[in-house]
Amino acid sequence: MPAPSYSTRAAAHPSPVARKLLALMDEKKSNLCASVDVTTTAELLALVEKLAPYICMVKTHIDIVSDFSYEGTVVPLVALAKKHRFLLFEDRKFADIGNTVKHQYAGGVYQIARWADITNAHGVTGAGIVAGLKQAAEETTSEPRGLLMLAELSSKGAIAHGKYTEETVEIAKTDKEFVFGFIAQGDMGGREEGFDWVVMTPGVGLDDTGDALGQQYRTVDTVVQTGTDVIIVGRGLFGKGRHPAVEGERYRKAGWDAYTKRVSP
């Protein structure tokens, strides 16, 4: 039996952010998230502009931008997201108690809850992290916000698997409107209980198998066939000798072709 399409899932999903994302993916024919780990605002905005037509989402590590300012970095980034129709995912990986993450998410210099449609968290401190982040989002903005839980990682020797992953899924189940999916390596189940998890997978490459710092790459086709909804690609799009627009379309097409295969009868 073929998997349900993004548009079918968008119509019924309990999370406003997931509905928006799945509909946008269907509209742009893209399940590609660009991971833009660059260290200046100029590089960030230029790279996003080149990749924008091919992606459904941009994933940032905003704290590595050395010349960050809200007005100079975030405001133009949000404008690009609106203009080119993609969501913003700040890969913050929150991992503290609820009261602390509430301040980290809403406050400080980055004010993540104000602008990032999506963020993520580890389950190591328990379900309080979900409640704290949701409260911060509700107190900060009327725009929909969504959380991904880190269930599995793509790096060599990662300890996020087995029992840890199972417990993280249980934490995710505590709020299906706010927690809409996982960073994971494939399908996370839950359909028989009424959950429709959106799975996003890093460590996806068409050419490389890994790097010297422990990253392990899997092919686009492999991850999509095992249940991944969004492929997260970084250096494959803009590494040395690569042209972002060319690679953006290449990965977009590979991701969409793999998805089409998955939903075809």
Swiss-Prot record:
In Swiss-Prot or TrEMBL terms, this protein is called: Orotidine 5'-phosphate decarboxylase
Which Gene3D superfamilies has this protein been placed in? Aldolase class I (3.20.20.70)
Quote the EC number.
4.1.1.23
- One Pfam family, please name it: OMPdecase
Q: Name one GO biological process term.
A: 'de novo' pyrimidine nucleobase biosynthetic process
Q: Which PANTHER family match?
A: OROTIDINE 5'-PHOSPHATE DECARBOXYLASE
Q: What keywords were assigned to this record?
A: Decarboxylase, Lyase, Pyrimidine biosynthesis
What are the top taxonomic ranks of the organism?
Eukaryota, Fungi, Dikarya, Ascomycota, Saccharomycotina
Signal peptide positions (record): none
This protein's GO cellular component annotations are: cytosol
Q: Which gene encodes it?
A: URA3
- SUPFAM superfamilies assigned to the protein according to its UniProt record, in alphabetical order: Ribulose-phoshate binding barrel
GO MF, one term, reads:
orotidine-5'-phosphate decarboxylase activity
Q: Which residues bind substrate?
A: 37, 59-61, 91-100, 217, 235
Which cysteine-cysteine pairs are annotated as disulfide bonds in the entry? none
Question: Which reactions are catalysed by this chain?
Answer: orotidine 5'-phosphate + H(+) = UMP + CO2
Family, per entry: Belongs to the OMP decarboxylase family.
**Entry annotation: catalytic residues:** K93 (proton donor)
Q: Which organism is it from?
A: Diutina rugosa
The protein's annotated pathway:
Pyrimidine metabolism; UMP biosynthesis via de novo pathway; UMP from orotate: step 2/2
